[in-house]
């Protein structure tokens, strides 16, 4: 019987429907790339596929098999009787035990393909139990999709027992053997398989490229695997062959491509997350089974890539095949979708993540960036954009990011940097830390190792990460965080102050330069502003009459919370109940402290304070009532530039030295002047609002000898 493997004519309506679905804005698409249809284009001449019936072949679903996954021409390809060796000593360690999201199922590739409806016989000559044969690598059940491009269920599986086992799949498919997760058998187990075809798999380290390309051209087996030590990619033969015909380098570089994938998986995922190949400690053991990517013609939820329990499933397109099979695409950091999917498998569960909001999006791109940087150094490939959704490249944005960090240390990252480029800027900072003193990412590996022992981590702030960083290098990294505008809590700063300041200006490290460290200079510790811990301070806001003076939700304790998105605003109303100036903020530091000056962050609203007078009592005896008229206050310093309208970002900290070091416990901040907006209309709705005062942070600092 002859079958014509040509989908375009038979399924034009379905293809049109799917094309529309891909471009509808309401669709739930995982990534935004230029993805073509997942079905085979078949622009070449039609192929006559001859099927010799009889011999027990089930032909009942040939028409469906012709559509997907394809038919084997029985006059071209012959079935084989072969012995298959499997290492059943490989261990399956559940994802939960490794503190990751997903690990590969214990599935073995066989290099064999079952023809549609053809009987496969598997013989087990010993008492081995716990094995299952799967025919068809496309395990997704697409029942909920309508219309569909293939039958919803195209796989068949059967448990294997000692002796002779038979199985057939009316649609055919690649043959996998899955081991029960708790089985630990012989390293040299052998089974016999009869009636299958050899698939033209490429196996790194054993396949000859020239012979392989010839096999691709002559066989009619429709699917194959590209296999390394840590990866196995199920791809369509015709699509791969078309790609090789267009670019023979794809085939020539296939050994290098799969070796690069193996290195990427082992280095950027396994080792990075503190997993080691073959580790005897199973909680630290990298998966023994390969990371699988299966290309399919259609995915659930109209996605074109998703994480399944057996691997990554991606749409069968030239774009995604190129991510898998092209050496240059991989080494230049353009295999974005596949790397992101692998990250979702190996990242920690959210409860154990150390990454705070300012950098969390950048962390996902670390493996891809490391691959691209390696490709730049080793092969000279220009780096991919890393964050294609930003619409700009790393090469364009990194210099801007470094210029931002190098300007000064009065920064506020989430306010200064546009949201669309924050991941690139944050990634630049993480790369700099990875190369501090030539550490080469070792700190991150140690961080991930430590996390495994934690039940949960508070990543609402950067404190956990910051403390771990300081402990690892035995240095205080506050200057680095300040240059990048990352918020630090007083607790974190106090903790780090036991270490000497970092001695290298690593924020000058330029990752893409020929000599990245050439601009890194020594960082002088003299003159650094060490901030006092304000955790025990008490603060009161009072008006000229001694009454509480703050607006709802904007109490004065917000000035001490290390969060510039909050702050104090004095009470106001639309009538005369807005209290008259001057206003006062009274601070009890709870102990007499050496103070060299104050820092504060302004407010860019119309209520921003314009003048602050910092005072302290002449007598530092215990004060029970800050309104006591017998207390004599003396001025230390006057600040009148906090709300200057031309300052680029008045929410960044500014530091003000005292004329000389003071020993103080109590401070009073006097605000005698109207706010910076002198354009309030004398109407009922705005009258007296010129009195309102507001700023976001206040604290004191000291110098170390």
Features from the language model and the residues they span:
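Beta-strand-enriched, solvent-exposed domains that form extended recognition/catalytic surfaces
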Residues: 40-200
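Beta-sandwich interaction modules
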Residues: 152-176, 637-677
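Exposed low-complexity, polar/acidic, P/S/T/G-rich flexible segments that act as propeptides
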Residues: 181-229, 677-705
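Catalytic cores of extracellular degradative/oxidative enzymes
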Residues: 222-435
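Active-site-proximal alpha-helical
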Residues: 233, 395-493
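Beta/coil-rich, acidic/histidine-enriched accessory regions frequently appended to metallopeptidases
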Residues: 460-555, 578-581, 596
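Aromatic, loop-rich ligand-recognition surfaces of beta-strand-rich domains
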Residues: 563-630, 650-705
